[in-house]
């Protein structure tokens, strides 16, 4: 192994503790890397440091060693519950890795306790562990650390415990912000004492990182470490011992090329990057069947509890394949990774550099290969200019085995594979539409038929992006995909139960629709009923003359009674009035009868 060195550890202006030097020898690091030689002396002189360095340059030791040295030089030794240092990192995997590196040193210093706080674990157990064992050095993800500061019910007062804090480290600061942890970090900073040393480490310096530097660091010393032998104006952002390749092939050829490559490199260790969690699930399952004799594991951001175990297991492997999303792209140090294969280019250019940086770490050699569609070829020049990352062409292999029919037969035999393929295709198209380099990765230029063949789809899914499009080059299978069963008998039983329920609901709904239809058919009858009622009403109105006369008589009688009560008329006049009203009514009726008799 060849190291990019900046002198031995003994050459530091501030001497290191003998046991720290012993731990470094055990780890096999006799020399410093440039970022270590630049930042460690500053940290140990109580300076705040904002360091930018290429991925794989040894940033972890650049803050682990100063933390130990600063805590060892404390006048008052830390009590069990006092926190002397906090390391915040964006992902669980990176936190586990840092905790592991730290443990190589703390085993020589039993006076220091360390604790790991990450998601995917029971927070109540974390609280109990801290109360029992303490945690002078905390390695944590932002969400879990913020949660711990807010917990009061379990008897943990972390705000009091951090009053003794000497060092805060924000590792992969740019990704902390990219992942939306700014609010959590600001909350955490409010709990921490102002008199502390702060280190901010990042692979890139953005405006957001600059804002965090201003908010969290006091008069920081800025360190920017470039690769040796490269002019500052054209400093490449990937390790100098990394060999970067690209391969241009059609969407329906890409999977065959990937499998061919992996079958010919079985004795090596690979990371295979996909753009979405659904793609990892689908292609990971396919690779398990098609690439025999090698350990294949899958990891992505939606795995809550398995991720930690899978990550630790893969790190220990001598050879194997880890199918993953960008959850593995930053800061993760997996020993002896030979190839980083980017089946899908990442959603932004900086992520390309971080993916490549999972190999060729700390002086090791390594290679990276990105698969590109013909319409994406201009991405090569873009990376060379924008990311200072030149790539060499690797030609596609001729006469590779066509494995897509095998993948189709897997989907026909197991509904789980069929559904995973459909979800993977949909998620890929949606991710493609959101690509930051949308002048190169244009959804409208995508050959959906070729892409669907590359996913070995049995039919095209229904999705907004495909609405109104025709695909004469894609031939769906002549099978009703609703009849494809799950191999898992329990899942298939549940599916059949659900289908039966849906059939019943459909029948009921059809009955309701039929009733509505019948109602429309009887409109004529309803119309007749309405007409009949209107005629009856009219007849009542036309035949109400006698009723009106009776009403008039009643009103006259009422008026006469009121006049009598008020003394306006006498009783004789009242009786005379009543008689007059009655005679008028009788006369009217009699006249009617006489007329009728005369007519007869």
Swiss-Prot record:
SMART domains assigned to the protein according to its UniProt record, in alphabetical order: DEXDc (SM00487), DUF4217 (SM01178), HELICc (SM00490)
Keywords per UniProt: ATP-binding, Helicase, Hydrolase, Nucleotide-binding, Nucleus, Phosphoprotein, Ribosome biogenesis, RNA-binding, rRNA processing, rRNA-binding
Domain Helicase C-terminal: 254-402
EC number of this enzyme: 3.6.4.13
Listed Basic residues bias regions: 514-537
Enzyme class per UniProt: hydrolase
Family assignment from sequence similarity: Belongs to the DEAD box helicase family. DDX55/SPB4 subfamily.
UniProt function note: Probable ATP-binding RNA helicase. Has ATPase activity and is involved in the maturation of precursor large subunit rRNAs.
Protein name as it appears in the record: ATP-dependent RNA helicase DDX55
Classification lineage: Eukaryota, Metazoa, Chordata, Craniata, Vertebrata
Designated gene of the protein: DDX55
């Amino acid at each position: 192994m060849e190291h990019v060195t900046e002198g031995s550890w003994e050459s530091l202006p501030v001497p290191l503790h003998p046991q720290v030097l012993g731990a470094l020898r055990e780890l096999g690091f006799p020399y410093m890397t440039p970022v270590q030689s630049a930042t460690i002396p500053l940290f140990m002189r109580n300076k705040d440091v904002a360091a930018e360095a290429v991925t794989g340059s040894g940033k972890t030791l650049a803050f682990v060693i100063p933390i130990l040295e600063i805590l060892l030089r404390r006048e008052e030794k830390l009590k069990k519950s006092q926190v002397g240092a906090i390391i915040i990192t964006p992902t669980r995997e990176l936190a586990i890795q840092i905790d592991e590196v730290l443990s190589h040193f703390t085993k020589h210093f039993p006076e220091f306790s360390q604790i790991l706080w990450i998601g995917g674990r029971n927070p109540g157990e974390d609280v109990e562990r801290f109360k029992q064992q303490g945690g002078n050095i905390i390695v944590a993800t932002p969400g879990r650390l913020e949660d711990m500061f807010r917990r009061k019910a379990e008897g943990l007062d972390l705000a009091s415990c951090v009053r003794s804090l000497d060092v805060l480290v924000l590792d992969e600061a740019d990704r902390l912000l990219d992942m939306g942890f700014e609010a959590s970090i600001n909350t955490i900073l409010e709990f921490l004492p102002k008199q502390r040393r702060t280190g901010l480490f990042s692979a890139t310096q953005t405006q957001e990182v600059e804002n965090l530097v201003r908010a969290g660091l006091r008069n920081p010393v800025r360190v920017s470490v470039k690769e040796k032998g490269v002019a500052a104006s054209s400093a490449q952002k990937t390790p100098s011992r990394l060999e970067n390749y690209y391969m241009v092939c059609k969407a329906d050829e890409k999977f065959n090329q990937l499998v061919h490559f992996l079958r010919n490199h079985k004795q090596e260790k690979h990371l295979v990057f996909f753009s979405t969690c659904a793609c990892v699930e689908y292609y990971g399952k396919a690779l398990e069947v098609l690439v025999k004799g090698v350990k294949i594991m899958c990891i992505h951001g939606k795995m809550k509890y398995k991720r930690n175990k899978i990550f630790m297991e893969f790190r220990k492997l001598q050879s194997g394949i880890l199918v993953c999303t960008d959850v593995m792209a930053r800061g993760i140090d997996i020993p002896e990774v030979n190839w980083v294969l980017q089946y899908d280019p990442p959603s932004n250019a900086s992520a390309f550099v971080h993916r490549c940086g999972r190999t060729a770490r700390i002086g090791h050699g390594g290679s990276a290969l990105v698969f590109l569609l013909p319409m994406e070829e201009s991405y090569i020049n873009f990376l060379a200019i924008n990311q200072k990352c030149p790539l060499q062409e690797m030609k596609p292999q001729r006469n590779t085995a066509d494995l897509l029919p095998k993948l189709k037969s897997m989907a026909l035999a197991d509904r789980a594979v069929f559904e995973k393929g459909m979800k993977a295709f949909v998620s890929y198209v949606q991710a493609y539409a959101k690509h930051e380099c949308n002048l190169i990765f244009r959804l409208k230029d995508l050959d959906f038929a070729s892409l669907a063949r590359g996913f070995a789809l049995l039919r095209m899914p229904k999705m907004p992006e495909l609405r109104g499009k025709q695909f004469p080059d894609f031939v769906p299978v002549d099978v009703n995909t609703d009849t494809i069963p799950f191999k898992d008998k329990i899942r298939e039983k549940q599916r059949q139960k659900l289908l039966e329920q849906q059939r019943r609901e459909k029948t009921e709904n059809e009955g309701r629709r039929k009733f509505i239809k019948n109602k429309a058919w009887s409109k004529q009858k309803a119309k007749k009923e309405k007409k009949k009622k209107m005629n009856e009403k009219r007849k009542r109105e036309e035949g109400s003359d006698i009723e009106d006369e009776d009403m008039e008589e009643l009103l006259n009688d009422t008026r006469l009674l009121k006049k009598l009560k008020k003394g306006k008329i006498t009783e004789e006049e009242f009786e005379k009035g009543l008689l007059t009203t009655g005679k008028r009514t009788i006369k009217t009726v009699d006249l009617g009868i006489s007329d009728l008799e005369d007519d007869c």
